[in-house]
A protein has these predicted regions:
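Conserved acidic residues
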Residues: 28
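Surface-exposed cleft-lining segments at the edges of enzyme active sites
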Residues: 38-46, 145-152
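Class I (Rossmann-like) S-adenosyl-L-methionine-dependent methyltransferase catalytic domain
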Residues: 1-22, 63-214
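Structured loop/turn residues at beta-strand edges in well-structured enzyme cores
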Residues: 25
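Hydrophobic adenine-recognition pocket in adenosine-nucleotide-binding enzymes
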Residues: 35
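A short, conserved alpha-helix within the catalytic core of class I
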Residues: 39-58, 67
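A conserved beta-strand element that flanks and buttresses the S-adenosyl-L-methionine
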Residues: 31
Length: 214
């Protein structure tokens, strides 16, 4: 209700869920900007099915669903290490790791070189690339965003899009629909505040254009 009131105040047209449920073959394009990962994070399986069915029904037969969202780690099970940028941020990174484990966003790290109240050396972690992906992209939000962001997964794979949209509703396989990878270099200084890295390890956003096959 708060969001709807803000949209009204800014003269922005919108549809309520009830209106969208009664909409059929209406839109040429439905644009999901940083929405897909939130649907995966917060909705139950029945709620996801209901939401994607509703969007598919509202789209014209020749319409397109555009998904712009986080990317993914292409080799999620590979084991590697990463180093915290300095001892001054050891504890902040460690807090994020503990919270992400608690919320089942990441698995327990295989090896953790963490000493409580150690002010001399930056921590070094050995874990999967998937864990590193989630840890790094979450930590840059800062602890003020911990409660909200630590509940969300940022891994948006083609397989996940296929599972929830393409196969159930007859869209082309998502891996063939990857339209663009964005590397926003303004992210790099924020990542380097917490981690010893020289370049962006992954795209900061990916864009899919999903088209119907029937």
């Amino acid at each position: 209700q708060i969001v709807q009131n803000q949209l009204k105040e800014n003269d922005i047209d919108f549809l309520t869920k009830e209106q969208l449920q009664n909409t059929e073959d209406e839109f040429d394009v439905i644009y999901l900007s940083s929405v897909f990962h939130e649907l995966m994070s917060y909705l139950s399986r029945p709620e996801r099915r209901e939401t994607f069915a509703m969007l598919d029904k509202a789209l014209k037969p020749d319409g397109v669903i555009v998904i712009r969202d986080w990317g993914y780690e292409p080799n999620p099970n590979d084991i590697t290490s990463f180093e915290v940028a300095s001892s001054t941020v050891n504890e902040e990174v460690y807090i994020w790791i503990k919270e992400l484990i608690k919320n089942s966003i990441i698995e327990n790290l295989r090896v953790v070189d963490h000493i409580e109240n150690d002010e001399l050396e930056p921590d070094i972690y050995v874990t999967t690339k998937q864990n590193i992906y989630e840890i790094m992209l979450h930590t840059v939000w800062g602890l003020n965003s911990l409660e909200r962001e630590a509940q969300e997964t940022y891994s948006v794979t083609p397989e996940l899009i296929d599972k929830w949209i393409c196969r159930p509703y007859g869209y082309r396989n998502a891996k063939f629909e990857l339209n663009q990878e964005e590397y926003d270099e303004t992210y790099l200084p924020y990542l380097q505040k917490y981690f010893k890295i020289d370049e962006l390890p992954w795209p900061t956003k990916i864009i899919y254009e999903l088209r119907k096959t029937k």
